[in-house]
Amino acid sequence: MTRYIFVTGGVVSSLGKGIASASLAAILEARGLKVTILKLDPYINVDPGTMSPFQHGEVFVTEDGAETDLDLGHYERFIRTKMTQGNNFTTGRVYEHVLRKERRGDYLGGTVQVIPHITDEIKRRVYEGGDGFDVALVEIGGTVGDIESLPFLEATRQIRSEKGANQAIFMHLTLVPYIKTAGETKTKPTQHSVKELRSIGIQPDILICRSEVELEESERRKIALFTNVEERAVVPLQDADTIYRIPLMLHEHGLDDIICDKLRIEADEVDLAEWVRVLDAKLNPLKSVNIAMVGKYMELLDAYKSLNEALIHAGIQGRVKVNIDYIDSEDIEHHGTERLAGKDAILVPGGFGERGVEGKIATARYARENGVPYLGICLGMQVAVIEYARHVAGWADANSTEFTHDTQHPVVGLITEWVNAEGKIELRDAASDLGGTMRLGGQVCHLKPGTRAHEAYGLDEITERHRHRFEVNNQFVEALESAGLVISGKSADHSLVEMIELPEHPWYVACQFHPEFTSTPRDGHPLFSGFVNAALAYKAARARAQQS
């Protein structure tokens, strides 16, 4: 029998519902429970796949190819359960499904309404997502009071009514602001936020109170009194120096015991040893490296959320502090590569569109010519191939058809056919819709023995997640290999280039997939660990050269 914990947010957005949900899930998992997390997004888009990174941040890709909210990345980094298509759905997807049923005549000519048809579809998806788990946390996007969230809140209210208080509870995350000029915290916003929830029939069972400073017992009592929440269930959550401390903080405040009591769960004693190790390694590094990340969405670093975390994870595995210098590729394009000087390694991440691409190409060239460790991901691999084709193979006009068709050497082109993870052939062309038409999800890659890629993974075959519609053009592969480029990874049917590297370079590796999506703080990822180790080696070699 699945228990449900519905997580809502109030006062302001971006309070960290995703981190709080993931942290609670990590504690419950550490008590021997099988846990999953769902994210319900109120926007009308079917999924975030076509949304601007500046608006939405990163699009996280699941193993089964879903383009989802970045919070699902947090979920996978905190718990062992892998997310799927069913772990994230939007208002747009719900309405799309209901309208499709209406067109088929499934409602027998009835009037289709928000209640019961939309709410019933939301409930169906929640029940389906939680099936087979001991506990399902359900995070509702947005802030209480938003008109877009109302159908989701109504559906969860109905689930609570159907399941009862011992099988479904509400956890509300609020902000308790600290007014520095007055030297005190204010509980009134929390009171009003709970009042808003209660006005639609939801009484929260637990309050997580975010605050810049530690909450006094008197303030917790006051919040409990005015919100009708049990005092011990008013859980303070002070700002932390790292998100990987949050599971330990919530456990210290007894949140998991409160949950188990309210849901009548008999669970094992908690074992958070892995999180203690992660936190110790994060806070007590023995070495440091400086890595330049050259991208095109630097105004919103959430666009690279999983990538940032993957570098931190690699640092945790080796007790290395990874300092990231975020550089806009347009700055490189317009002002040159001076900002790359002195860096221990360079990373070029994915992206879409022509803007800033020449800056990325210049970055790849700088790393190649100066022997600086380089990791290219998705577009980062494509620009490495373009750069190599232009300056080593001698094709000055080499480019990608994503950016121009005016080239004799389109070394990167649109994928028109590939074999998906289920062994089926998928076809695309330039007229295909943008949404949901990329090569998505986990794909098998065969690694070439004796390469740095094979050395990093220690495997002949790997599975990594993809999100792209352009790929290295096979017409030019043989000529590129003759010019010295090594194809170190190929797709399951050996038809697509998945990884490239330069054998004479200290560490120059690029991949078409997104390894950051499978990195976790407890396990890291072999490719990022190899990259950080290469940065350490380069830094040490440079120091020796300066001393001699």
From Swiss-Prot:
One of its GO terms (molecular function) is CTP synthase activity. Signal peptide: none annotated. ATP binds at S14, L15, G16, K17, G18, I19, D71. Residues 1-265 are annotated as: Amidoligase domain. PROSITE patterns: GATASE_TYPE_1 (PS51273). Allosterically activated by GTP, when glutamine is the substrate; GTP has no effect on the reaction when ammonia is the substrate. The allosteric effector GTP functions by stabilizing the protein conformation that binds the tetrahedral intermediate(s) formed during glutamine hydrolysis. Inhibited by the product CTP, via allosteric rather than competitive inhibition. Pfam families: CTP_synth_N (PF06418), GATase (PF00117). It catalyses: UTP + L-glutamine + ATP + H2O = CTP + L-glutamate + ADP + phosphate + 2 H(+); L-glutamine + H2O = L-glutamate + NH4(+); UTP + NH4(+) + ATP = CTP + ADP + phosphate + 2 H(+). Pathway: Pyrimidine metabolism; CTP biosynthesis via de novo pathway; CTP from UDP: step 2/2. L-glutamine binds at G351, L379, G380, M381, Q382, E402, R469. The active site is at C378, H514, E516. GO terms for biological process: 'de novo' CTP biosynthetic process; pyrimidine nucleobase biosynthetic process. Residues 290-541 form the Glutamine amidotransferase type-1 domain. Keywords: ATP-binding, Glutamine amidotransferase, Ligase, Magnesium, Metal-binding, Nucleotide-binding, Pyrimidine biosynthesis. Belongs to the CTP synthase family. Homotetramer. CTPSs have evolved a hybrid strategy for distinguishing between UTP and CTP. The overlapping regions of the product feedback inhibitory and substrate sites recognize a common feature in both compounds, the triphosphate moiety. To differentiate isosteric substrate and product pyrimidine rings, an additional pocket far from the expected kinase/ligase catalytic site, specifically recognizes the cytosine and ribose portions of the product inhibitor. This is CTP synthase. It comes from Chromohalobacter salexigens (strain ATCC BAA-138 / DSM 3043 / CIP 106854 / NCIMB 13768 / 1H11). The lineage of its organism: Bacteria, Pseudomonadati, Pseudomonadota, Gammaproteobacteria, Oceanospirillales.
